[in-house]
Amino acid sequence: EMTSSLVGSEMCIRDRYLINQGIQQLTKDHSLVEEMVRLGGIKPEEAKHHPDKNIITRAIGAKADVEVDFYEHRLKRGDIILMCTDGLSNMVEDEELFHIVQGGRDIVESGQALIEAAKENGGTDNIGVVLIEPFADEVSVL
């Protein structure tokens, strides 16, 4: 069992994905564009490149009280958690993220391959990647 939380768009880690048989985004940003998607104003594929994608609707310190979203996830053997900045998620489509992580490399090589894919796709923003394999037999750190 894993609990994650979110306020805003997480300056350090923007997106959290669960990867196993497919890719699933675990959290939703508190952003104007995410709200537009939720209300049907734009399609999810339009959100990634929308000019207002960085306008957040919730942030720590913006008000005395802030609402935090908590998410519960049941994990199983083979799951891999990907946390990343938008320097990765804006440059590499979900399908490519999935294929890189499930491509038979070890977790460190997968992380390096994700960064390279973002650079090859024209990434100029900072690219942060954390991959966690909760049921791994050994720990690898880069």
Name every feature range the model reports, one short phrase each:
Residues 1-8, 13-15:
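Single conserved hydrophobic/aromatic residue that forms the stacking wall/gate
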Residues 10-14, 55-64, 70-100, 119-121, ...:
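Conserved beta-strand-loop-short alpha-helix elements that form
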Residues 18-22, 134-135:
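Short acidic-glycine loop/turn motifs at beta-strand connectors
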Residues 28-77, 141:
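Conserved, helical-rich catalytic subdomain that frames metal- and/or nucleotide-binding sites
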Residues 107-120:
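Short, well-structured alpha-helical segments that form the helix of a local strand-helix-strand
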Residues 135-142:
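P/S/T/G-enriched low-complexity
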